[in-house]
Curated annotation (Swiss-Prot):
Lineage: Bacteria, Pseudomonadati, Pseudomonadota, Gammaproteobacteria, Pseudomonadales
DNA-binding region: 234-253
GO molecular function, one term: DNA binding
Cysteine pairs bridged by disulfides in the record: none
Cytoplasm found in the keyword field: yes
Entry keywords, A to Z: Activator, ATP-binding, Cytoplasm, DNA-binding, Nucleotide-binding, Transcription, Transcription regulation
InterPro entries, per the entry: ATPase_dyneun-rel_AAA, CbbQ/NirQ/NorQ/GpvN, CbbQ_C, P-loop_NTPase
PANTHER family tied to this protein: DENITRIFICATION REGULATORY PROTEIN NIRQ (PTHR42759:SF7), MOXR FAMILY PROTEIN (PTHR42759)
Compartment list: Cytoplasm
UniProt KW Metal-binding keyword: no
Similarity comment text for this entry: Belongs to the CbbQ/NirQ/NorQ/GpvN family.
Protein name according to UniProt: Denitrification regulatory protein NirQ
């Protein structure tokens, strides 16, 4: 049974750019804040293009071997197991490296030959050199807000990609996303969007992160399930945004102005 196409509300020309990049064998870089729809966009495009998707959530301990594969030992001896990047190349699918700057530096070395005209993947441990088929696509993402001197994409890496900038949607679009993702009433969606915009204005004051579209969707789903709106906004918005009780209380004052 085919999986349903994920809901996605386009905010610009990102679908057209992605499709053109795929047709020409160009890798794509997605940059934008947490919870603004980067991962959902890749899921949507994989289904739209009818391609297998291999998603990897990058972290500090993720190295090239985790992407390429490794030899395993079992009762029947030693065998090679492909990693997600290798499987995507073999199958001609999409490999999505989410928050790629979090991974170790050797991962960058591994993807460079795939992100230029060579479109090759070298498996040093098996001696194979895989030529990516035309349908293969490499997609990476990162949050520019987390950039620092120790963790960031080098210019030599960024310039191998077509880049798409994502941000939180305009109010009307974000309301449609909330309705589409949660099934909530349009009036509730509009109030939650207004709340989200009010919370985002606090970014430069008390919060390290702002209220993402993802968190607004969580709140809409909980309210739609019958939870008290104020409590839903507390657990889905205020508490995830801060551990400081005074800050949470201040956020709840803003919630009371928009939802309760």
């Amino acid at each position: 049974m085919r999986d349903a196409t994920p809901f996605y509300e386009a905010t610009g020309h990102e679908i057209e750019v992605f499709e053109r990049a795929w047709r020409h064998g160009l890798p794509v870089l997605l940059k934008g804040p947490t919870g603004c729809g980067k991962t959902r966009f890749v899921q949507y495009m994989a289904r739209r293009l009818e391609l297998p998707l291999y998603s990897v959530a990058c972290h500090d301990d993720l190295g090239a071997a985790d992407l390429l594969g490794r030899h395993l030992i079992g009762a029947d001896g030693t065998w090679w197991q492909d990693g997600p990047l290798t499987r995507a190349v073999r199958e001609g699918g999409i490999c999505y490296l989410d928050e790629v700057v979090e991974a170790r530096q050797d991962t960058t070395v591994a993807i460079h030959p795939l992100a230029d005209d060579r479109r090759e993947l070298y498996l040093e441990r098996t001696g194979e050199t895989l030529q990516a088929p035309p349908s293969f696509m490499l997609v990476v993402s990162y949050n520019p807000g987390y950039q620092n001197l120790l963790k960031g994409l080098k210019p030599s890496t960024r310039q191998r990609f077509v880049a798409l900038r994502f941000d939180y949607p305009a109010a009307q679009q974000e309301a449609r996303i909330l309705v589409g993702e949660s099934g909530c009433a349009e009036t509730l969606a509009q109030r939650l969007v207004q709340l989200g915009q009010a919370l985002r204005r606090l970014e430069q004051h008390d919060l390290e992160e702002v209220a993402s579209t993802r968190l607004l969707i969580f709140a809409a789903r909980l309210i739609g399930d019958g939870m008290d709106p104020r409590e839903a906004c507390r657990v889905a918005l205020a508490e995830p945004l801060s551990d400081d009780p005074a800050t949470v209380a201040a956020l709840m004052d803003i919630v009371d102005l928009h939802v309760a």
